[in-house]
Amino acid sequence: MSFDSNLEELYQKFCKLKSILEDPSQLSVDSFVAASKEYSELLPVISVIDQYNSLQKDIADLEELINNPETDHELKSLAKEEFYERQKQLPKIKNKLKLSLIPKDRDDARNAILEIRAGTGGEEAALFVTDLYRMYTKYAEQKNWKFEQINSSSTGIGGHKEVSLCISGSNVFARLKFESGVHRVQRVPETEASGRLHTSAATVAVLPEIEEVDLKIDEKDLRIDVYRSSGPGGQSVNTTDSAVRITHIPSGIVVIQQDEKSQHKNKNKALKVLRARLYNLEKQKRDSEISQMRKSQIGSGDRSERIRTYNFPQSRITDHRINLTLYRLEDIMKEGNLDEFIDALIAEDEANKLKNLHI
């Protein structure tokens, strides 16, 4: 199907939706909501199609004027100038149109649950988790996003085996989703007398936060265990059974929450994480090209699987997916200035989606 045929088909679909919505009495509530949503999503695309069609018509009219033997010389000269000017605008509006046709990720507007776990590298990996946590919270502050720590497991000397947080604000998931994967760090540990460079890793998973109304979990599918929370080294830090472990029996997903002193708060936080993981699992099943299985998304923590490398001696960060290297490690890690990486990853994603449009 040609580019213009695709646009015509889309326009016809829009007109049909408009006609349906003008007589809502024929629709059920659910059908009306679905049609309204689709209509709203098409509106900005139709606006660009109108611009494109108007430009095409102008070009055709000018061409007809130029080729008309009755057109006087002066008018023909002006028409040619206008014709070439409009022709130059065509690729730009066509590209704008293609970008508007890229399928939108409906999760982009959602808040995100960010999980960071230590991979290979022992204590160095745990310290790197803390570094990444600081980097992302600084980035959230820059964007005026709110964040709340959901769970953490510290090593007692500044590192974390894992830490998770919920980040809320405008387009959080859209900007953070490409952070999922294995992050590798290369640096000389403070305790390393010989000055030998160590390589360790941490895994990052970014999941869209799912509201309870969006995903219902059947209580009978859950096994909920409560116990006393523990701190570093396993010692008990609470005299009541406030820690919660929820197992989703059909999927085998287990969520542990013990940061709060209240069992009720821990349960609510654990359910929030469980909803996000279950939604992510379903999303992966629906479209394996957009999202791989969770284990594939975050990797095993092996040093060989990495999306980004942080080299401290060279003050260098390299994103291996887009071959982008920046020599601003401290600025990025301590101040959270991640936009250059994130903007480049979004642009790369859009370019890849454009290739797959086949128009």
From Swiss-Prot:
Methylated by PrmC. Methylation increases the termination efficiency of RF1. The keyword Methyltransferase does not apply. GO terms for molecular function: translation release factor activity, codon specific. Residues 290-299 have a biased composition (Polar residues). The keyword Transferase does not apply. Residues 285-305 are annotated as: Disordered. Pfam families: PCRF (PF03462), RF-1 (PF00472). The modification N5-methylglutamine is found at residue 235. It is found in: Cytoplasm. Its main location: cytoplasm. One of its GO terms (cellular component) is cytoplasm. HAMAP family: Rel_fac_1 (MF_00093). Belongs to the prokaryotic/mitochondrial release factor family. Peptide chain release factor 1 directs the termination of translation in response to the peptide chain termination codons UAG and UAA. PANTHER family: LD18447P (PTHR43804:SF7). This is Peptide chain release factor 1. The lineage of its organism: Bacteria, Pseudomonadati, Pseudomonadota, Alphaproteobacteria, Rickettsiales. The gene is prfA.
